[in-house]
Amino acid sequence: MGILAKIEQPRDLKGLTYPELEQLAQEIRAEMIDVVSANGGHLAPNLGVVELTLALHRVFDSPKDKIIWDVGHQSYVHKLVTGRQKEFKSLRLYKGLSGFPKRCESPHDCFETGHSSTSISAAVGFAKARDLRKEKNQVVAVIGDGAMTGGMAFEALNHAGHTKTNMIVVLNDNEMAIAQNVGAMSSYLNRLRTDPRYDRSKDEIENLLKRIPGIGSKMAKAAEKAKDSLKYLLVPGLLFEEMGFTYLGPVNGHDQIALEQVFEQAKMVKEPVLVHVLTQKGRGYEPSEKNPALFHGVGPFNKVTGEVIKKPAPPTYTQVFGETLCELAEKDPRITAITAAMPSGTGLNLFAQKFPDRFFDVGIAEQHAVTFSAALAFGGMKPVVSIYSTFYQRAYDQVLHDVCLPHANVVMAIDRAGVVGDDGPTHHGVFDISFLRVIPNLVFMAPKDENELRHMLYTSLQLDGPVALRYPRSVGQGVELTEELRELPVGKAEILQEGKDITLIGVGPMVYTCLAAAVELRHRGVEATVINLRYINPLDRESILRYARMTKRIITVEDHMLAGGMGSAVMEVLGDEGLTDVVVERLGYDEYVDQGAISLLHQGYGLSVVGILKAAERLKVLQRIEGRSSV
């Protein structure tokens, strides 16, 4: 039996020798590689924090002491040493262990995360609650240098420093978020990592300046006058010191002894402390060390070779989006592309290679990305800002206030719309229809397949005013991509087939599910109208009302929440017209959706052929057909 099998709770770590800890670290890395190679997951971030996690749990007393993992995708080691070893093979599977901290899983998961830059705010909250309750415990936020580029992190640092809150921030600096970090903070941290001048004292520099013949004394005096600048040159972490934090580091994040020593030191400080830890993303697995971006969030792979297992499949919507945008940008130099630290995930890496001057990765800063795009538009460009649906939630005010209210020509590409699979509820994109369709001047569309996505992107760039375009994470339908692009009439749905008995309205790829269900209904004698809605805003009220009056029965199908979704919009149209004799069945989600394969999630919520047939039965469509035939 190895050492890992004997670790049931963090207290079991405290009696281990350093050679035993080194062996344990190897076992943990092997276990994570084994499980993630089968299930997929965030491998590289976790390989980089093994020693760091062990040190935290040896020095601090979880769950009494609160350890908060920013984003949370680097919490696998934490899960393995906090009593979830036996369930670890179910990581990210349907009904299995979450890939992120979840309060319902363990008392050691004190705060749920999934989006970045929230941990310091949470730590301040826990610390203030502790102080108000007169309790004695430590609060630790672990945040990566990528997440530190998020504005929310600095809001929390500012609050903690101003209030002198007794808490610890561990800056896990691996020089990467998902892709290579960008921005001034990244440059600043890089100087802390690499600049040997931090090891010199102010006196040594002044003495060196004085030795320069003729001008040395004057230079030393100039340096004295510029003491603030010199201080920034000489004192590591001064940015954090100026914000009210005691800065400790940088520390080798793979040196177990050094980590434990610095954490013990941090515990002695009764004011906010920032511990700067240097780690290697992907450490201990050669393929991941060579390509940490690929193994940041990876699907199943061959653990011997590191080769990702890919089945033959059509291109993804994301790939088609990125390629089409490049195609359009070749002809229009005004087209620019913006992303928030996700160039590869949003399909914009090809655009970045072809048009580097027109590509902007603003870091983990969705609010800035959207407002920046609005000003680009008013400056004469055609910005396309691509962000995951779940992260657009962070920029809602900017969408409303900076893009839509002044009618900016911004195309908002909403990637990962609908359920996304194994990453679970923090990453599902199932709220965007609800919060975007209420904006009066926003043209909001969703393609049924990858070819329609091309035409919608082309249409978006021809329109005057803000446009939102939502599409899923999955592969396309495998349809032919037409070369010639055309504009799609705004606010007009596509009637794919007509039938007198029931109307099926789908949005996005759910349209194909409606078509498949219509075939099954036909086998039962039910003739269905199938509508590809295309535009969520403005709605094709004319088509909705026409077929509602004809069939009296409607089923709406959407990969989205029911409340405020497309089905709700259809019912609003019917209500406005007073069509009380039309009955509607809405298929979608009515709760936070768990993790699992997309197909399993769709089936579980009735977004399937079987689900549509059951909805038709609830509408008594079959009984109506049987009644007509017996007359």
From Swiss-Prot:
For the protein in the UniProt heading, the enzyme class is transferase
Kindly state which reaction or reactions the protein catalyses: D-glyceraldehyde 3-phosphate + pyruvate + H(+) = 1-deoxy-D-xylulose 5-phosphate + CO2
Give the matching Pfam families: DXP_synthase_N (PF13292), Transket_pyr (PF02779), Transketolase_C (PF02780)
Q: Tell me a Gene Ontology molecular-function term this record carries.
A: magnesium ion binding
Q: Determine the domain of life of the protein's source.
A: Bacteria
The UniProt entry's GO biological process terms, in alphabetical order, are: 1-deoxy-D-xylulose 5-phosphate biosynthetic process; isopentenyl diphosphate biosynthetic process, methylerythritol 4-phosphate pathway; terpenoid biosynthetic process; thiamine biosynthetic process
Q: Which positions does UniProt annotate for Mg(2+) binding?
A: D145, N174
Q: State the EC number(s).
A: 2.2.1.7
Q: Which InterPro entries match?
A: Dxylulose-5-P_synthase (IPR005477), THDP-binding (IPR029061), Transketo_C/PFOR_II (IPR009014), Transketolase-like_Pyr-bd (IPR005475), Transketolase_BS (IPR020826), Transketolase_C (IPR033248), Transketolase_CS (IPR049557)
Q: Give a GO cellular-component term.
A: cytosol
Q: Which cofactor does it need?
A: Mg(2+); thiamine diphosphate
Q: How does it assemble?
A: Homodimer.
Q: What is this protein called?
A: 1-deoxy-D-xylulose-5-phosphate synthase
According to its UniProt entry, this protein's organism is Desulfitobacterium hafniense (strain Y51)
Q: Gene that codes for this?
A: dxs
